[in-house]
Amino acid sequence: MATTATMATSGSARKRLLKEEDMTKVEFETSEEVDVTPTFDTMGLREDLLRGIYAYGFEKPSAIQQRAIKQIIKGRDVIAQSQSGTGKTATFSISVLQCLDIQVRETQALILAPARELAVQIQKGLLTLGDYMNVQCHACIGGTNVGEDIRKLDYGQHVVAGTPGRVFDMIRRRSLRTRAIKMLVLDEADEMLNKGFKEQIYDVYRYLPPATQVVLISATLPHEILEMTNKFMTDPIRILVKRDELTLEGIKQFFVAVEREEWKFDTLCDLYDTLTITQAVIFCNTKRKVDWLTEKMREANFTVSSMHGDMPQKERESIMKEFRSGASRVLISTDVWARGLDVPQVSLIINYDLPNNRELYIHRIGRSGRYGRKGVAINFVKNDDIRILRDIEQYYSTQIDEMPMNVADLI
């Protein structure tokens, strides 16, 4: 909300040790007034939404859902620090759906995300969860036809999920009307700032009604995020995971010493049979490297698919569809894939390049062991990467061992 609020000191926050089976070692540092609601049935949700939640396959709310949904529904501004794989997307999606007046065919909630695929996934999740509610939801993203956006928005959408640039463009054109918006959700806010969306987020915010409720989700809370929460939020509730406790639990992490860049390719070829036991994602730091590696793998007769931010939207969507369905098993990608894209079968991640910043590490690796599934992460480490690897270990209080010969047995 528009008035500035200084965040309460952590002295007033209470540490809670969670007792859920797969969250045993995560400590939440959470505002005093946050209660735990152990079931969806006791959250006071509408019947048609509950049906959608259970039809989706959810049984019991995750730790973040048990704490955040009720607070958001109450209308409180909420800062939730939550890593990938904790059920954060469903947290705000369920809350948004609960707060809609379906009779009113105007945009009532706006969700901003850093990547096009993430916005589309949020939109699809909303439509699935809101299946029995007759909800209208549109993904407003760059790389798609502007005319189609205008047509969909004119038709009337209860919720718009999108990337900041295209959303702001639609607001400026007056196609996206903001007068009925009650809630703004900033998903993966840290990554939106990393991608230089800060100005556009502020631009969008200026067009919203002054009493708009703000929900911010972020894996990390750097200074710029806290500055934003001070500007946008009133007395926010905090639901935070202490940084040192962000869990990489259930994910076995290894490194392979490759000495030089040229040796990585042969190492990957040696591992290919292991990759295809399940589904694997291979991360490179640049689009050029993704294209180069994809071509080189195909020349060596290995089947791989690839994806990065320069590809046309349609192409990226069909690649994701193939990968989700299991038709393709090995995907080479940049970090565009690392944020929030949910493919349950992925249990192996390879960092062909170590990520450029340590926050990205948990986003990449967090893909491979979602909701307590076990996963394996393998990091290719050149001589001059050893320092970065040790830094990641220290930052996350974790251990990354040399890859054993029997790695296939661990997947």
Curated annotation (Swiss-Prot):
Cross-link (Glycyl lysine isopeptide (Lys-Gly) (interchain with G-Cter in SUMO2)): 19, 152, 314, 374, 382
Residue ranges annotated as motif DEAD box: 187-190
Catalytic activity entry: ATP + H2O = ADP + phosphate + H(+)
Protein role: ATP-dependent RNA helicase. Involved in pre-mRNA splicing as component of the spliceosome. Core component of the splicing-dependent multiprotein exon junction complex (EJC) deposited at splice junctions on mRNAs. The EJC is a dynamic structure consisting of core proteins and several peripheral nuclear and cytoplasmic associated factors that join the complex only transiently either during EJC assembly or during subsequent mRNA metabolism.
Modified residues (N-acetylalanine): 2
Matches recorded under InterPro entries: DEAD/DEAH_box_helicase_dom, Helicase_ATP-bd, Helicase_C-like, P-loop_NTPase, RNA-helicase_DEAD-box_CS, RNA_helicase_DEAD_Q_motif
Positions of post-translational Phosphoserine modification: 10, 12
GO cellular component: cytoplasm; nuclear speck; nucleus; U2-type catalytic step 1 spliceosome
Subcellular location: Nucleus; Nucleus speckle; Cytoplasm
Placement of sequence motif Q motif: 38-66
Keywords assigned: Acetylation, ATP-binding, Cytoplasm, Helicase, Hydrolase, Isopeptide bond, mRNA processing, mRNA splicing, mRNA transport, Nonsense-mediated mRNA decay, Nucleotide-binding, Nucleus, Phosphoprotein, RNA-binding, rRNA processing, Spliceosome, Translation regulation, Transport, Ubl conjugation
Residues with Phosphothreonine modification: 163
The protein, known as: Eukaryotic initiation factor 4A-III
EC number: 3.6.4.13
Lineage: superkingdom: Eukaryota
Family: Belongs to the DEAD box helicase family. eIF4A subfamily.
